[in-house]
Amino acid sequence: MTSPNNYLAKIKVVGVGGGGVNAVNRMIEEGLKGVEFIAVNTDSQALMFSDADVKLDIGREATRGLGAGANPEVGRASAEDHKNEIEETIKGADMVFVTAGEGGGTGTGAAPVVAGIAKKMGALTIGVVTKPFEFEGRRRTRQAEEGIAALKEVCDTLIVIPNDRLLELGDANLSIMEAFRAADEVLHNGVQGITNLITIPGVINVDFADVRSVMSEAGSALMGVGSARGDNRVVSATEQAINSPLLEATMDGATGVLLSFAGGSDLGLMEVNAAASMVRERSDEDVNLIFGTIIDDNLGDEVRVTVIATGFDAARASAAENRRAGISAAPAAEPVQQQVPTTNATLPPEKESIFGGAREENDPYLSRSAGARHRIEETRSGGGLFTTGNDRDYRRDERREDHRDERRDERRDDRSYDRRDDRRDDRRDDRGDDLDVPSFLQ
């Protein structure tokens, strides 16, 4: 007869680097059951203090067990050198959690290698990582972003917890150790919320296939945790979870949601239904909503809710595509046909000039400038805020034409002056001849 254990999903949690191993230790201290813990590090000393089921020192050759020195390339190379050992430790897993603190050397560089191996071996691979605090520096933040991008390529689902959001959970006296401990607790709650759904039978049961349907190839995910007591406790805890400061964005439009309720035996179905309906309203209309309940009388009247929302990448890409399609499908606005005045057209006389007197703008130059303004406004109506090349060409031609007109007017004036001078000279000559003739005759 086949043992029922053969049909239980095998879940392994791999902590990579200092932050990942600390998170694993925290989960072990909290008594997380039903999973196998694996610690992977380049720091031999840190591994000595871990209670993980399997400890894998990948820095024996590259770093002599002294750590990666905050260099992700060292962490990546160390993991590559021990691929066979990593494969051996992950073998047989149905689901693998890879936890790490991004920004350092081993976690940033080795976590994508570990996740890639797990994914290649057919395990549902979930990354749960933290982003560094701002006070840890720009270099660490930049390395973290690069590591997160690499993890996203190889994980089915990636949950990123920004440490800076943890500051919103504490008061002004929150210590550094308390902040990092809070980060480990968030990682623990996320992993526990998922594993408990699979490993602990509940009133509303969820199996591994349900979890896979939501988290396989899901891309980025958001995770929120809430707890409450007293009246309306389930709805209150759910509101805390979906409005958690740990979420970098809202869960609106999620196409996949895992919803876990944990409480005592008095946990009511109606209040669970009300909370699940609230989550469904925030999600995509075709959301794949998987929710389950876990009965734990040790919680007393407390209710804990874990929400993991996935499918944002596809939903947002589809929304962006729809917006682009809507823009491209919209008919182009026809340009307004405006009557462009000719150079001989005149504008209506203005009643008052800037000097208080009447003024008529019947000068061709002013009329031509008005026409230019009409043409430029018409061009800009189709070209946005920036001046187009046609505007510049027109103004250049306009200046040339104005210059030619001015030169033509000057020459015309010169010729008129010359003709008047010639007439004066002729009159002088005529008068001179009248005077000179008699004297000559004399």
From Swiss-Prot:
The entry's keywords: Cell cycle, Cell division, Cytoplasm, GTP-binding, Nucleotide-binding, Septation
Residues the record lists as binding GTP: 18-22, 105-107, 136, 140, 184
Region (Disordered): 329-442
One Pfam family here: Tubulin
Compositionally biased intervals (Low complexity): 329-341
GO CC annotations, alphabetized: cell division site; cytoplasm
Protein role: Essential cell division protein that forms a contractile ring structure (Z ring) at the future cell division site. The regulation of the ring assembly controls the timing and the location of cell division. One of the functions of the FtsZ ring is to recruit other cell division proteins to the septum to produce a new cell wall between the dividing cells. Binds GTP and shows GTPase activity.
This protein's name: Cell division protein FtsZ
Native organism: Corynebacterium glutamicum (strain ATCC 13032 / DSM 20300 / JCM 1318 / BCRC 11384 / CCUG 27702 / LMG 3730 / NBRC 12168 / NCIMB 10025 / NRRL B-2784 / 534)
